[in-house]
Amino acid sequence: TTNSLVEISDYLYKKNPEGASTIINQLERKYMGHVEELYNTEEWKEKTRNFLKEQFRYLRSFTKTHFTSFEEKVILAEGEIISTNMVTNYLLESGINAILLPALEMIRTDKNAEPDFHYITEKCNHYMSENAGYQIYITQGFICRNAYGEVDNLLRGGSDYTACLIGAALQADEIQIWTDIDGMHNNDPRFVEGTQPVRQLHFAEAAELAYFGAKILHPTCIQPAKFSG
């Protein structure tokens, strides 16, 4: 999806709305197909279809306006917005008491494009206290607003960074980053067979491994957890 959204933006930068519309149509058909595969009841299929129609109508609106980096960031945010809504609907249909909390209302950067941790802490705790009692809380990764209230992104670390910021803001006991291997290993499993996970690392050691290429974790993800202890 992200590649398609980047492609849409590229077409619009090149003043080719027809090319952008073609990709938007392809992406909409893809997601409408997912609706048929994912949901069992017509009620939730229809609810999700209506949501998707609204989002893709919004995407098409960018083919008729002047296109800048601001619009590009809004378009790139749609992947997270669509996927988290679909997952939340799936959980609700399955009888799981889940709620979607909007990252664009909780995650903000300051004028230096760094996470505004005071704001993030205040908003995350507010939304959690206002919505207590749910089994599962879902939010978007990577996307945020900047100091001027515009849709933006965290630039580095992606969704992992968002998870660490929220975990630190809520003073969580544990932050889990799910990937294709179980933790940081004693060697790079892409090149060495039979590697073993390292059971315990200091923040500085984890940050150094990430900095020197441990793909499991972006170096910036260490800082929020270290800051909150």
Residue ranges and their predicted role:
Residues A225:
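Acidic-aromatic/histidine active-site loop/patch
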Residues T1-I222:
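Nucleotide/pyrophosphate-binding catalytic subdomain
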